[in-house]
């Protein structure tokens, strides 16, 4: 988490944009749309452009030389591939110089089933693959599918695995009521991880007030 030197409502648009991972993940996007959205994110000064891994070569030229980097997602949005498959995908995208972070999805079926050892072991191998190339890993939980105890326990899985961030939502979950990055969920995650890793809010951040509130939370 960034060390706050001022309140969010005192920040410039550029400073606020530096907290944003600009999502360009919808499967129906054409390559033309992906390029235009990538350009938009760079122009705004977003921290990263979050893209599907098949578009690395397409998007890389548009972030090179800018303050914006790429954040490819792996095994997204379900997190149910084999560990070997996840690791291979991470190794492919992590080789790009323009990659700052890689987003992966924890197997929330395992989480809901109480199989936390499997969750930790899976994440640990993914983290090792990313760190080998100097890339950070953000682990998405799908907090809307979990209760408080499951969220807290998964935070500990991520810490044990060496993850750099814990993250709330993919934005693609179905079958559950969408709440995303509520202040309540963010507070729970921050309590559990302490200074051992960072927390990233994603999903259902629809208003300026909500966005600024999350920044002020740290």
Question: What role is predicted for each listed range?
Answer:
Residues 89, 94-142:
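Hydrophobic, well-structured mid-protein blocks that either form specific transmembrane helices
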């Amino acid at each position: 988490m960034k060390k706050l030197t001022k309140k969010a409502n005192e920040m410039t648009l550029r400073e606020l944009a530096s907290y944003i991972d600009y999502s360009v993940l919808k499967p129906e996007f054409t390559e033309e749309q992906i390029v235009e959205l990538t350009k938009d994110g760079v122009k705004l000064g977003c921290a990263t452009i979050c893209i599907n891994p098949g578009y690395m070569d397409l998007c890389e030229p548009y972030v090179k030389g800018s303050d914006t980097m790429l954040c490819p997602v792996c095994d997204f949005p379900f997190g149910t591939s084999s560990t070997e498959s996840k690791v291979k995908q991470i190794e492919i995208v992590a080789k790009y110089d323009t990659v700052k972070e890689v987003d992966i999805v924890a197997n929330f079926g395992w989480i809901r089933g109480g199989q936390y050892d499997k969750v930790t072991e899976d994440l640990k191998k993914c983290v090792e693959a990313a760190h080998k190339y100097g890339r950070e890993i953000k682990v998405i939980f799908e907090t809307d599918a979990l209760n408080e105890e499951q969220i807290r326990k998964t935070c500990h899985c991520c810490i044990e695995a060496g993850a750099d961030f814990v993250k709330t939502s993919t934005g693609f979950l179905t079958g559950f009521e969408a709440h995303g990055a509520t202040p309540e969920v963010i507070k729970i995650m921050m309590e559990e991880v302490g200074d051992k890793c960072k927390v990233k809010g994603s999903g259902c951040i629809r208003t300026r007030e909500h966005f600024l509130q999350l920044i002020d939370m740290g």
